Amino acid sequence: MLTYLEQKINYEFKDKTLLLEALTHSSWAHEGKNEKVSNERLEFLGDSVLSLVISEYLYKNRKDLEEGSLSKYRAEIVCEPSLARCARKIELGSFLRMGKGEEISGGRDRDSILADAMEALLAAVYLDGGLEAVRRVILDLFKEIIDEVLKGIIYRDYKTRLQEVVQSMEVGKITYELVEEIGPDHNKTFVTQVKIGDVVLGIGQGKSKKESEQAAAMEALSKLGILK
């Protein structure tokens, strides 16, 4: 099964334990498995590796852009929705090791979990094969997103888009519900779910309520097949 994932990213691991670590959600150990490993440390590294590769690509290929524009484009390319989109492209959720509770709650298709796992996977490639190897993987997986961002065609107002889709389906009214606030006051993460009636369409998180609502709407659009 892991071989199939390696084929998806066009990279074969020399150290399979790195790949397994990248695929292990923290809930796996929390539910009594005899393993303390999770992908959280790799996720930390992968965030920086991805940022470096995309920064380098933009710097070398868009000499017309000033620092502010470079930062803006990079943020669009490496954001959670983009990472989750790449994860779905390679069916990453189906390979994750996670606790039953997390799986039952829809963890395999949750943007935040997919994005974190994607960063962990990139870090694993970096540690296993070096910068050139992970550069190839990133630029291949993110090619469509990079092109769309640079052409200005990425649709980032997901709430408006979801509203349009739901209205056309005539299935009811959308509501957004703040379900959790994580962390201290100076560094809060907000978790929001978007619903039609009692049916949860998507869950998202962000550093503001608005950002978490956009993330929830984006996940809903992905599940509805509007975003791929």
From Swiss-Prot:
Main localization (coarse): cytoplasm
Alphabetical keyword list: Cytoplasm, Endonuclease, Hydrolase, Magnesium, Metal-binding, mRNA processing, Nuclease, RNA-binding, rRNA processing, rRNA-binding, tRNA processing
Domain DRBM positions: 157-226
Protein's UniProt keywords contain Heme: no
EC nos: 3.1.26.3
Signal peptide: none
Cited HAMAP family: RNase_III
Name of this chain's protein: Ribonuclease 3
Organism name: Caldanaerobacter subterraneus subsp. tengcongensis (strain DSM 15242 / JCM 11007 / NBRC 100824 / MB4)
